[in-house]
């Protein structure tokens, strides 16, 4: 049984200057016609903007009176010469973002299986947003990109616009169902360069914001691990924190996240603190405490490198002679005294290095203990450098007390391995974005570096050979090796000279002495300038692009109140109409003379004051008749219409959409609606009148931009049991090609067959509707 409830809600997509269309009375069926439809379905046909179709069936207009669709339960009619697919004209009109495009149906059939090819099918008017008044299909997409897409159908060549970002063009291609590999070669680099840059800059981002939010949710404020940025960007404590945790699906503990809030049920110490400690040592931008840890690590890195350099200065080196008594190799001879020269550094430098190693050891153990993936941790080059730089110090301390020859050999080797400590300088890449940009630039410019090496190798080989034979011209016949008049005694020595000359260094240790050798040297210098000048600008451009994007991401303000779009609704450009629902079964408590649905109900989560429309009953939830914050109601709204009266505003059906189907909206739309279950997160302040975002200049249109929608969730159980939960109707479960999510309603707890309104159990948390 369908139960209709009209609730007021703000529809932001309606224009402020549009006048609501006047309701048109529903045409009455003749006396010989079948029994009238139930009031809910008649009410659907009595919407504003209703007009009669050529076949006499009323068409209900969507919000704003823009789109017309057949009323559910009535036979479909031909929707114009283009929309119905039965017209004699071969042209079709497509309105994309307000720009009308006209083409032939045969043009759209050139790429079968795409979205535009689906417009030529007979059922296109029922699947897409078709307006019979203007005889066109409407898509709310980028009109400039669509011009290139339509030209691809006409010419068979897909070009990329230069004034559109690559990811946007990729998103539009995915929406229209076109493969990106069809882009022409002349536009491929323009199409790919932005995506390549973003892929390379993914590592510049801080750890996952959701993980940071989960880490702060469980009491990071109490632990002193959050700051003003974290509290504004990802903290979940405070008002509505529990609701946000549920929307983040964090109540039971996510992967790598805390099991719950501080002291939450079922939470463990490890699941609460593991992500926080990991972010404390890994991400310097996660909290104020993480910044302090990063500064401490940076300080010890600089001290360790300074100590390493001072150990080689003669002012910190002490040379001492130690006499060691050793047995004589000659039998019966007295022991021999052997004097050994030992080099020792200042003791305080050793102590300073020991303090630095203790800090690095503590940091390394904390990171390896609390890392989420130890295998990936051990694969990191920076972590390997940490381990290799720490081990020699402990081995040297442990072997310093031994006097055996093997121990001394190991100590000598460890002193040589001390140079590994200088590699700690690469740990600075965690704290400076410019160093990370440089590393990514070198990796992204690998092909250019290989090309540069090949050019240099060819030039070195050619000019080293030429300088060797050029210096032999005019040489003394008695000087076979040419050591008396030239430095180039062989070709391998000429390799060094060619490298120094081609890179324009010119050390001066080797130079030609003959006129022929000087000519070869001049050609070598010119070739080196041209060889290096070709690939270097590409490397510089890569660095400039990566660095500018990295700086832009750092300076980008945090979106604390990001607007999350709603699922496609009737009248939306991406809305696809469902199949007409079947007639509802007769109510068991009514006679055969007619079908009377139960009185409309309003869930308490909807927040609608119905005290003026329905008297209290035994099955009416008290929250329905109680206004204000206590009853979650909204005072001051007009009462709901009585059953059978036409809805004064445009209807809106609550449907459950298929998120997995990417055909109508594509992956970008599914990603945009990923958190639609929780629209209260990161949204602007809501108006207490209609639960709509408050924006400057929007208060004046609240009284005009309202709409109602139908809640079709009452279906009595045939076995007489009490139904709990929300069940979708069969007619809505077969909808294909929609994206979005279903609305979360409070559980039902009403025996079937009750003549009163369905009672809805009070929710444990405030409704997010």
From Swiss-Prot:
K(+) binds at residues 504-507. The modification Phosphothreonine is found at residue 750. GO terms for cellular component: axolemma; axon terminus; calyx of Held; cell cortex; cytoskeleton; dendrite; dendrite membrane; dendritic spine membrane. The chain crosses the membrane at residues 292-310, 352-371, 381-399, 413-435, 449-470, 519-540. N-glycosylated. The modification Phosphoserine is found at residues 687, 692, 731, 734, 742, 754. It is a multi-pass membrane protein. A motif (Selectivity filter) lies at residues 504-509. Keywords: Cell membrane, Cell projection, Cytoplasm, Cytoskeleton, Glycoprotein, Ion channel, Ion transport, Membrane, Metal-binding, Methylation, Phosphoprotein, Postsynaptic cell membrane, Potassium, Potassium channel, Potassium transport, Synapse, Transmembrane, Transmembrane helix, Transport, Voltage-gated channel, Zinc. Zn(2+) binds at residues 159, 165, 186-187. Residues 1-291, 372-380, 436-448, 541-769 are cytoplasmic. Residues 211-222 have a biased composition (Low complexity). Disruption phenotype: Mice lacking both Kcnc3 and Kcnc1 are born at the expected Mendelian rate, but the pups do not thrive and all die about 26 days after birth when kept together with other littermates. Their failure to thrive may be due to motor problems; mutant pups survive when fed separately, but 45 days after birth their body weight is only 50 to 60 % of that of wild-type. They appear uncoordinated and display severe ataxia, myoclonus and spontaneous whole-body muscle jerks, but display no obvious alterations in brain morphology. GO terms for molecular function: metal ion binding; voltage-gated potassium channel activity. Pfam families: BTB_2 (PF02214), Ion_trans (PF00520). Residues 8-66, 202-231, 557-627, 679-701, 746-769 are annotated as: Disordered. CDD domains: BTB_KCNC1_3. Detected on Purkinje cells in the dentate, interposed and medial nucleus in cerebellum. Detected in brainstem. Detected at calyces of Held in the auditory brain stem (at protein level). Isoform KV3.3B is highly enriched in the brain, particularly in the cerebellum, where its expression is confined to Purkinje cells and deep cerebellar nuclei. Isoform KV3.3A is not expressed in cerebellum. Belongs to the potassium channel family. C (Shaw) (TC 1.A.1.2) subfamily. Kv3.3/KCNC3 sub-subfamily. Homotetramer. Heterotetramer with KCNC1. Interacts (via C-terminus) with HAX1; this interaction modulates channel gating. Identified in a complex with ACTR3, a subunit of the Arp2/3 complex; this interaction is indirect and depends on the presence of HAX1. The segment S4 is probably the voltage-sensor and is characterized by a series of positively charged amino acids at every third position. The cytoplasmic N-terminus mediates N-type inactivation. This is Voltage-gated potassium channel KCNC3.
């Amino acid at each position: 049984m369908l139960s209709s409830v009209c609730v007021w809600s703000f529809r932001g997509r309606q224009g402020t200057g549009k006048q609501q269309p006047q309701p048109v009375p529903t045409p009455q069926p003749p006396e010989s016609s079948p029994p009238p439809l139930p009031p809910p379905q008649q009410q659907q046909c009595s919407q504003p903007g209703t007009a009669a179709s050529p076949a006499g069936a009323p068409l209900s207009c969507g919000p704003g009176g823009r789109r017309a669709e057949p009323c559910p339960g009535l036979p479909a009619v031909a929707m114009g010469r283009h929309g119905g697919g039965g017209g004699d004209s071969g042209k079709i009109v497509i309105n994309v973002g307000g720009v009308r495009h006209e083409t032939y149906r045969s043009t759209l059939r050139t790429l079968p299986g795409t979205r535009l090819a689906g417009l030529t099918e007979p059922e296109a008017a029922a699947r897409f947003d078709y307006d019979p008044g203007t005889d066109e299909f409407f898509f709310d997409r980028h009109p400039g990109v669509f011009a290139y897409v339509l030209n691809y159908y006409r010419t068979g060549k897909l070009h990329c616009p230069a004034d559109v970002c690559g990811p946007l063009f990729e998103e539009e291609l995915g929406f229209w169902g076109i493969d990106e590999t069809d882009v022409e070669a002349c536009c491929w680099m323009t199409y790919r360069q932005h995506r390549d840059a973003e892929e390379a800059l993914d590592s510049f981002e801080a750890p996952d914001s959701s993980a940071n939010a989960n880490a702060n949710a469980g009491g990071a404020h109490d632990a002193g691990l959050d700051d003003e940025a974290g509290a504004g960007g990802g903290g979940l404590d405070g008002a509505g924190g529990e609701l946000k945790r549920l929307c983040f699906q964090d109540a039971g503990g996510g992967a790598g996240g805390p099991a719950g809030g501080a002291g939450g049920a079922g939470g463990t110490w490890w699941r609460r603190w593991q992500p926080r400690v990991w972010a404390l040592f890994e991400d310097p931008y996660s909290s104020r405490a993480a910044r302090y840890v990063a500064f401490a690590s940076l300080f010890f890195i600089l001290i360790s490198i300074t100590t390493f350099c001072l150990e080689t200065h003669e002012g910190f080196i002490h040379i001492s002679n130690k006499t060691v008594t050793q047995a004589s190799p000659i039998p019966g001879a007295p022991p021999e005294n052997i004097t050994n020269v030992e080099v020792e550094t200042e003791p305080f430098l050793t102590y300073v290095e020991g303090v630095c190693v203790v800090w690095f050891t503590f940091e390394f153990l904390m990171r390896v203990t609390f890392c989420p993936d130890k295998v990936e941790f051990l694969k990191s080059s920076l972590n390997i450098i940490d381990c290799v730089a720490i081990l020699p110090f402990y081995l040297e301390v442990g072997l310093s007390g031994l006097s055996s020859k093997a121990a001394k050999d190991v100590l000598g080797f460890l002193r040589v391995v001390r140079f590994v400590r200088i590699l700690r300088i690469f740990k600075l890449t965690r704290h400076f974005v410019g160093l990370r940009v440089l590393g990514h630039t070198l990796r992204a410019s690998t092909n250019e570096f290989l090309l540069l090496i090949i050019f240099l190798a060819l030039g070195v080989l050619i000019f080293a050979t030429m300088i060797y034979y050029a210096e032999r011209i005019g040489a003394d016949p008695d000087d076979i090796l040419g050591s008396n008049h030239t430095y180039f005694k062989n070709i391998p020595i000429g390799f060094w000279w060619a490298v120094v000359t081609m890179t324009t260094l010119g050390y001066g240790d080797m130079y030609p002495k003959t006129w022929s050798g000087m000519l070869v040297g001049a050609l070598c210098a010119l070739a080196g300038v041209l060889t290096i000048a070709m690939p270097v600008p590409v490397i510089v451009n890569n660095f400039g692009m990566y660095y500018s994007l990295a700086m832009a991401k750092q300076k980008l303000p945090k979106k604390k109140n990001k607007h999350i779009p709603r699922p496609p609704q009737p009248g939306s450009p991406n809305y696809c109409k469902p199949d007409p629902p079947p007639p509802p079964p007769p109510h068991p408590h009514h006679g055969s003379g007619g079908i009377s649905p139960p009185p409309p109900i309003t869930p308490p989560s909807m927040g609608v004051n119905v005290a003026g429309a329905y008297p209290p009953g035994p099955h009416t939830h008290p929250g329905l008749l109680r206004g204000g914050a206590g009853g979650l109601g909204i005072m001051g709204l007009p009462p709901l219409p009585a059953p059978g009266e036409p809805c004064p505003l445009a209807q809106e059906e609550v449907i459950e959409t298929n998120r997995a189907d990417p055909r109508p909206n594509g992956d970008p739309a599914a990603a945009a609606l990923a958190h639609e279950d929780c629209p209260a997160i990161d949204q602007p302040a809501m108006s207490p009148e209609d639960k709509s975002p408050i924006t400057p200049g929007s208060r004046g249109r609240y009284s005009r931009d309202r709409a109602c929608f139908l809640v079709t969730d009452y279906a009595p159980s045939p076995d007489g049991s009490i139904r709990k939960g929300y069940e979708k109707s069969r007619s809505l479960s077969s909808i294909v090609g929609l994206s979005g999510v279903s609305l979360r309603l409070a559980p039902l707890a009403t025996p079937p067959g009750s003549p009163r309104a369905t009672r809805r159990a009070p929710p444990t948390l405030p409704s997010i509707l």
